[in-house]
Amino acid sequence: LPRLRHFYGREKELDNMANLIEARATTLLVPGIAGIGKTTVASKLIERFMHRRNLLYHRCQDWEGSRSFFESVADWLANIGDSTFADYLAATPVPQPADAARLLVDALEGTPSLIVIDDFHKVADATLHQTFQAMSLALLGSEEEIALVLFSRSFKPVVPTKDAEGRIASLVLPLDGLDSDAGRKLLSSFDELADEQWLHIHGLSRGHPLVLELINRGASAGAFHETLENYVTVEIFSKLSAEQKRVLSALAIYR
């Protein structure tokens, strides 16, 4: 799990996720823009179920395919006493999504579990997408204590929200900015922060944790606009195509 320097707020979001997970077998999709705190929330969610469920945290990488993920799952299942999935991988050069999902859910029968997948937007492997789609449907109506939680920058419905009969297969819980009280605690570098100034900053940042941290870093020199511009340039603008940059330039002129 990633190390957290600090953590403020998010109690409402965490309570909501925990209640849904405890209520029944479920799949949750938690989308949010870059820097909004998805990995932090994922870490805290796992902490809530520590010593209560078998836990798997997997952070996706750009280069990753389904095979490497399946091998991680096989090792995890073997550690909790079930080698069925590992045997399947050893005998199957090209695992099938439906089979992999069924074996995974079957292996967790009678085993309270929480599977947290972080940075799912990085996954381009169709087999892995189809496996999670099949797993979300397999969990539908299950009486087992199994939960699958996907954290992603993408707001696209990567898992089905309903099955063919209209039953809810997954829930989408978008992650927004911090509330006013939690966000203000991130501005530790400000010696004095008037309410009016804080309201302006919170309105500007919309409670975005990373934006608030960048503002905090520039507080002593009064240069937080520069840190924000650097972040936008490196993390967003530099990754756009030429056509996307032209569209943004046009919008900036004619807004």
Positions of predicted regions on the chain:
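Conserved adenine-nucleotide phosphate-binding loops and their immediately adjacent elements
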Residues: 1-19, 84-88, 184
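Winged-helix-like regulatory helical subdomains adjacent to P-loop NTPase cores
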Residues: 4, 11, 201, 221-255
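Alpha-helical sensor/transducer elements of the RecA-like P-loop NTPase core
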Residues: 10-13, 40-42, 72, 130-218, ...
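Phosphate-binding P-loop
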Residues: 18-27
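P-loop NTPase Walker A phosphate-binding motif
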Residues: 28-58, 154-156
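A short hydrophobic beta-strand->loop->alpha-helix junction that borders the nucleotide-binding pocket
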Residues: 55-65, 90-93
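Conserved NTP-binding/hydrolysis module of P-loop NTPases
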Residues: 67-87, 103-105
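Conserved Walker B catalytic segment
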Residues: 99-151
